[in-house]
């Protein structure tokens, strides 16, 4: 939505039709009227695609066409359910299977993102917001580590890493458990910023 407000072309994939409908409503009712001036020929330009954002089939023959990817994939181990579609990452309970699909998605994003140029200060980022989960005696599983390794494997460069502090309303309820189990509260998510260099 922020991209549309800045008059950028927006392409969105989601397997949840309701999400796409909500975005479309916001773009049509709030962004487009603000951006469309009587003297301007620039209108909001967007394409919302009700399909798998891993495969991105519509763009399977394309390359070097995207200036920026913003991506918020589901947590690992089917922590939250968004659809019943088996292609949806939220439905993959197997950790290895989940990351195999993430690798497919990242390869597609690498193919589609434009090339960055460090010397000239041209950055065409792939921004992925990821989280972590505590799994009892299996410990803390952080998605950023695994996704950084996938990025390195497929030839993406980790340009930056941003830690976002969360302020969950239920935070006070987990303080006791945190003390008893001797771990800190999970109050952060991570943004990984990848780029593709020649």
Pin down the residues of each PLM region:
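Class I S-adenosyl-L-methionine-dependent methyltransferase catalytic core
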Residues: 1-198
């Amino acid at each position: 939505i922020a991209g549309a407000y800045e008059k950028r072309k927006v392409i969105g994939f989601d397997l949840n039709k309701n999400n796409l409908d909500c975005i479309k409503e916001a773009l049509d009712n709030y962004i487009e009227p603000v951006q469309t001036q009587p003297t301007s020929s620039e209108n909001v330009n967007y394409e919302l695609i009700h399909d798998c954002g891993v495969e991105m089939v519509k763009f399977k023959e394309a390359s070097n066409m995207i200036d920026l990817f913003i991506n918020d994939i589901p947590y690992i181990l089917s922590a939250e359910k968004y659809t019943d579609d088996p292609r949806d990452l939220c439905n993959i309970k197997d950790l290895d299977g989940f990351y195999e699909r993430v690798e497919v998605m990242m390869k597609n994003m690498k193919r589609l993102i434009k090339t960055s140029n460090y010397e000239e200060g041209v950055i065409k980022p792939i921004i992925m917001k990821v989280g972590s989960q505590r799994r009892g005696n299996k410990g803390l599983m952080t998605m950023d580590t695994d996704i950084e390794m996938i990025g390195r494997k497929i030839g993406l460069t980790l340009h930056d890493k941003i830690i976002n502090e969360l302020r969950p309303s239920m935070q006070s309820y987990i303080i006791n458990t945190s003390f008893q189990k001797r771990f800190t509260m999970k109050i952060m998510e991570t943004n990984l910023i990848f780029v593709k260099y020649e």
